[in-house]
Structure formats: C-alpha cells, structure tokens
C-alpha cells in the first residue's frame, strides 16, 4: 500500500478541501526531496573525497621514493604506490560512487513525478471529477506505450 495515497485519501474522507490537501501533500513532497538531496549529498561527499585520498597516497608514495633515492631498487615500488593510489582514488570515485549518486538522483526524480501524479488524481477526486476524466488526465502523463496498456485496463 502506498502511504502517500492513503494519507491523501484519508484527508479527503476527513473532509479536507482541495487547497488544504494540496498544501499538505506538496509539503510532504518537498520534505521527501530534501531528505533525498541530503542522502545524495552524503554519497557525493565520497565522490569528492576519494580522489583526495588518492592524492594523499600519491604524496606518500613520492615521499617514500624521494627518501630512498640512494637505493635504486626502492624507487620502482615507491613510484608504483604513488601511481596506484591515484588510480584507486579515481576508480572509487568514478566507478563506485558516481553511479550510486546517479541512481539516487534518478529514483528521487521518479518518486517526485509519481507523487505529483498521485496528487493530481487526489485533486480530481476532491473536485468530484468523473473517474474516466481523472484516468485520462493521469494517463496523459505516461509514455504512449504505457497509455495504451492503461486504456486496456479500463
């Protein structure tokens, strides 16, 4: 069951008018967006932090390399540490965390659109519009392929 829809329907059953319904539900959508943005920001922090950690590793590798310039055999392994930590930082940021941020943004946008569609349906109910009119209005927000499936279900 969709709690957002249930809450809106309960408000209508309890006698809330359209204006009160819209105000309350839009407030819920805004709160949800703020929560999502906060979570996206936390993961974005890791996207920004990973290359910095890679650079710290690079500096450590360079310090090790420069500290042992007298021993030619130690230069290679120290240089490898320097280069690998840069690679690890870029890999973690771009291959692990960036896709997570992208998915979080996509899911958030999807949920906002979904809730706005639910709100439009609830507004139609509050205005006592015909069920067919509400159905047509909501179907118009769908891609054409899904619209045809929606009409068959009617």
Task: Give names to the regions the model predicted.
Residues 1-39, 111-154:
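Large intracellular
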Residues 28-107:
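Helix-termination/interfacial motifs at the ends of transmembrane alpha-helices
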């Amino acid at each position: 069951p969709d709690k957002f829809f249930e809450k809106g329907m309960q408000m209508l059953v309890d006698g809330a008018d359209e204006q009160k319904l819209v105000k309350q539900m839009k407030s819920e959508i805004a709160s949800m967006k703020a929560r999502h943005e906060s979570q996206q920001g936390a993961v974005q922090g890791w996207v920004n932090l990973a290359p910095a950690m890679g650079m710290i590793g690079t500096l450590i590798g360079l310090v090790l390399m420069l500290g042992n310039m007298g021993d030619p055999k130690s230069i290679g392994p120290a240089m490898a540490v320097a280069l690998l930590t840069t690679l690890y930082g870029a890999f973690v940021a771009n291959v692990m965390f960036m896709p997570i941020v992208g998915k979080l943004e996509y899911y958030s946008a999807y949920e906002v659109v979904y809730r706005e569609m639910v709100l439009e349906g609830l507004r139609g109910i509050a205005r006592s519009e015909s069920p067919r009119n509400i159905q047509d209005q909501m179907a118009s927000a769908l891609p054409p392929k899904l619209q045809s499936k929606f009409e068959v279900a009617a």
